[in-house]
Curated annotation (Swiss-Prot):
Residues 163-249 are annotated as: Disordered. GO terms for biological process: anatomical structure morphogenesis; BMP signaling pathway; bone development; cardiac conduction system development; cardiac muscle contraction; cartilage development; cell differentiation; embryonic pattern specification. Residues 186-197 have a biased composition (Pro residues). This is Mothers against decapentaplegic homolog 5. Homodimer. Forms trimers with the co-SMAD SMAD4. Interacts with PEBP2-alpha subunit and SMURF1. Interacts with SUV39H1 and SUV39H2. Interacts (via MH2 domain) with LEMD3. Interacts with WWP1. Interacts with TMEM119. Interacts with ZNF8. Interacts with RANBP3L. Interacts with HK1. Interacts with HGS; this interaction attenuates BMP signaling. Phosphorylated on serine by BMP (bone morphogenetic proteins) type 1 receptor kinase. Ubiquitin-mediated proteolysis by SMAD-specific E3 ubiquitin ligase SMURF1. The gene is SMAD5. Residues 271-465 form the MH2 domain. One of its GO terms (molecular function) is DNA-binding transcription repressor activity, RNA polymerase II-specific.
Amino acid sequence: MTSMASLFSFTSPAVKRLLGWKQGDEEEKWAEKAVDALVKKLKKKKGAMEELEKALSSPGQPSKCVTIPRSLDGRLQVSHRKGLPHVIYCRVWRWPDLQSHHELKPLDICEFPFGSKQKEVCINPYHYKRVESPVLPPVLVPRHNEFNPQHSLLVQFRNLSHNEPHMPQNATFPDSFHQPNNTPFPLSPNSPYPPSPASSTYPNSPASSGPGSPFQLPADTPPPAYMPPDDQMGQDNSQPMDTSNNMIPQIMPSISSRDVQPVAYEEPKHWCSIVYYELNNRVGEAFHASSTSVLVDGFTDPSNNKSRFCLGLLSNVNRNSTIENTRRHIGKGVHLYYVGGEVYAECLSDSSIFVQSRNCNFHHGFHPTTVCKIPSSCSLKIFNNQEFAQLLAQSVNHGFEAVYELTKMCTIRMSFVKGWGAEYHRQDVTSTPCWIEIHLHGPLQWLDKVLTQMGSPLNPISSVS
């Protein structure tokens, strides 16, 4: 009790009152300073303090927006730490474990949500909800393989990999990014299945040329095995996908439950592993991410923080001056978030990062191997579990090879400072001084279970044509 009394000895009554609703018991001093800074802003607005207290004291009751002026960069500094205001106060009064603004969505009643970019921003913690990971529907794998070998996509996949441009195309966020093109899969005329978005010629890619994506299926292939009725992949998937079981008989009226084996998605202990490379040399051990928020930076942190992968600690006897210089510029590096079934990469470094994600490229209508540049202070969604689930569900009826091809989508490559591709003198990621490879465990393990259920491929998987 003595320590608590000393803590609040110089605290104003208004701050004390608001701290009474604080959640969690960590970082008392930081929370006090955050609330004190807020009180000073709200006192200038008539009725704002009363409205905030009403919202905090009656969580289930409707409340008005409680706003503060938006700063130039949108962030608020509290005791040497900068953060987004709605995240700070949601952390203080609702969710102490909140990591990122990607975990929050405003309620419809909020007139000044952070994302609206207005001059005022609402910090009422009860005007935001936390994003929950959507439940992915199981993939229905046919028990008896009725797949026609003539429909095999293996030849198409091989042709694609042989004809992929020697140097990947490049795109820069946000300049090259538009709404995904919703050209549907070519399906047979009588197909009862809704179209899925794709892009037959990668319309958003610079100088589009070459073969179609492995996900554009020839018109004579059998229809997808299962997919949700709403075409949500061209949207930003802000609404959870309907995963109720009653959609299965509507979509698959001719397939009984005895003919298919459902294979469910399971969340692994570690959502990803990260491996660090210098040129074509792997350096150090893999980092296994258990925290949904992971920092990969160029510093040294001997504390063995489970949410931080410090590249500065790793040594390499083959390191040259170019690598040394690049490592010095990694700085704060990249912040990886895994939120609501989506993976985001936020560039914290002063230098850009460069990302090759087939899932992200598919969503934006780029060629699968396109390398996307993410400038400093920008954030990009690089993987979406729901879109992957829909692709996997469609692929099972196209044979083992079609499903196996999706393993490429579960690995994301990212270089620091130096880019690669058609617009750079480095043609391949292994020519960049410092890069990481991210393996997404959940999707990979799901693929493994589906492939095991499907049995052997009709043709052996081989690197030899």
